[in-house]
Amino acid sequence: MAGSTAEQHGDGPLVGVLALQGDVREHVRVLQGFGARTRLVRQPKDLPGISGLVIPGGESTVMDKLSRQFGIAGPLRSAIDDGLPVYGTCAGLIMLADEIVDAIHDQRSIGGLDVSVRRNAFGSQTASFEVDLDVPALGDPPVHAVFIRAPVVASVGPAASALASLDDGRVVAVRQGALLGTSFHPEVTGDLRFHRLFLDMVEDAGRTL
């Protein structure tokens, strides 16, 4: 898969998965399970025709460098500004955030989502954890969430809304129009309601690049 942008054929919307680094395969599998067609996106030429995009978890600093190296960062921001639905998980949330409060030297985000995030807010890989989250927008039961070297939303701007928070009040899921972000990894738990929500957002947007 790493060397191909091949699409799955079907009747569902064509959803891209940013395939620079991270858990790309898991998101492709989930999206195809819902009947969506998928395309791996690495370069600007991969954007035309998609109706939505998932930015997977991984390492945000590496994604940032590669997105600039492959020339996709600027065109993707333009697509976001034009209303492309995008869902970012973990590092993908960092990439969508307008501000990274603890960015390393020269680290940038693509932006578009009116939030500030803090990287690795819960510690190292060994500090990963699981928790059940109340997500009113998704109803019952609670969402079982896995946090792996996860970011946290440090502040939510007026354009965005919090969808879920931990018991201590820290925000871990947000939405702003056609943009969706989670600190955790729904693709690894089997609770796929956030992906279903995103595909509903894609359908509601009714657009392609």
Curated annotation (Swiss-Prot):
CDD domains: GATase1_PB (cd01749). Keywords: Glutamine amidotransferase, Hydrolase, Lyase, Pyridoxal phosphate. SUPFAM superfamilies: Class I glutamine amidotransferase-like. It catalyses: aldehydo-D-ribose 5-phosphate + D-glyceraldehyde 3-phosphate + L-glutamine = pyridoxal 5'-phosphate + L-glutamate + phosphate + 3 H2O + H(+); L-glutamine + H2O = L-glutamate + NH4(+). Pathway: Cofactor biosynthesis; pyridoxal 5'-phosphate biosynthesis. L-glutamine binds at G58, E59, S60, R119, I148, R149. Belongs to the glutaminase PdxT/SNO family. HAMAP family: PdxT. Catalyzes the hydrolysis of glutamine to glutamate and ammonia as part of the biosynthesis of pyridoxal 5'-phosphate. The resulting ammonia molecule is channeled to the active site of PdxS. This is Pyridoxal 5'-phosphate synthase subunit PdxT. It comes from Clavibacter michiganensis subsp. michiganensis (strain NCPPB 382). The gene is pdxT.
